[in-house]
C-alpha cells in the first residue's frame, strides 16, 4: 500500500473538496490518462486495486504512471465508543482528488489495450472518470 514514510503531524483535519484541481490536469508522462470528474478521497487500497487491474490486463509490457499519492491520514474511532474523548486513531491514508485531476497514465501499449485497462481501473474507483489522450496541445507544453 502507498503511504507516507514520515509525517510532521500524525493527524489532519478533514478539509473541504471545493473547486477544480490545481495542477496535474494534463497527461504528462504517458499516452493515455484517467481523469477524475468528481471530487473524492481515493484510498490507498483503491489506488492499488486500480493499479493491479491494469497490470493484469497488460500481462507484460506497458508502463503505468500513478499521478496521485495518499498523503492525507484519515482517522476512525473504535466500534461502540461514545463521542468525545479525542480524535480517533489513524485508519489509513487517502489522496484528495478534485475534478480534472489525471490519476493514472499508461504508455507503451496499443490504444485498445490502454482504453480497456483504464476503463477497468475506473471501475475500481468510487468516482466517475473519463479517459483522455495526449494530444498535440499537450506535447507543445
Swiss-Prot record:
Keywords from the UniProt entry: Ribonucleoprotein, Ribosomal protein, RNA-binding, rRNA-binding, tRNA-binding
Molecular-function GO terms, alphabetical: rRNA binding; structural constituent of ribosome; tRNA binding
Domain of life of the source: Bacteria
GO CC annotation: cytosolic large ribosomal subunit
Gene3D superfamilies, per database record: Ribosomal protein L10e/L16 (3.90.1170.10)
InterPro entries hit by this protein: Ribosomal_uL16, Ribosomal_uL16_bact-type, Ribosomal_uL16_dom, Ribosomal_uL16_sf
Record GO biological process: translation
Pfam families per UniProt: Ribosomal_L16
Protein role: This protein binds directly to 23S rRNA. Interacts with the A site tRNA.
Subunit structure: Part of the 50S ribosomal subunit.
NCBIfam families: rplP_bact
Family assignment from sequence similarity: Belongs to the universal ribosomal protein uL16 family.
HAMAP family xref list: Ribosomal_uL16 (MF_01342)
Name of the featured protein: Large ribosomal subunit protein uL16
Amino acid at each position: 500500500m502507498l503511504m507516507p514514510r514520515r509525517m510532521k503531524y500524525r493527524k489532519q483535519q478533514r478539509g473541504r473538496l471545493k473547486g477544480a484541481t490545481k495542477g496535474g490536469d494534463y497527461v504528462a508522462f504517458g499516452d493515455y490518462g484517467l481523469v477524475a470528474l468528481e471530487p473524492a478521497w481515493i484510498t490507498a487500497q483503491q489506488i492499488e486495486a486500480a493499479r493491479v487491474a491494469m497490470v493484469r490486463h497488460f500481462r507484460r509490457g506497458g508502463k503505468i504512471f500513478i499521478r496521485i499519492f495518499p498523503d492525507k491520514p484519515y482517522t476512525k474511532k473504535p466500534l461502540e465508543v461514545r463521542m468525545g474523548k479525542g480524535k480517533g486513531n489513524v485508519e489509513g491514508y487517502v489522496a484528495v482528488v478534485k475534478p480534472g485531476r489525471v490519476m493514472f497514465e499508461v504508455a507503451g501499449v496499443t490504444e485498445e489495450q490502454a482504453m480497456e485497462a483504464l476503463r477497468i481501473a475506473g471501475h475500481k474507483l468510487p468516482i466517475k472518470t473519463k479517459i483522455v489522450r495526449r494530444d498535440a496541445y499537450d506535447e507543445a507544453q
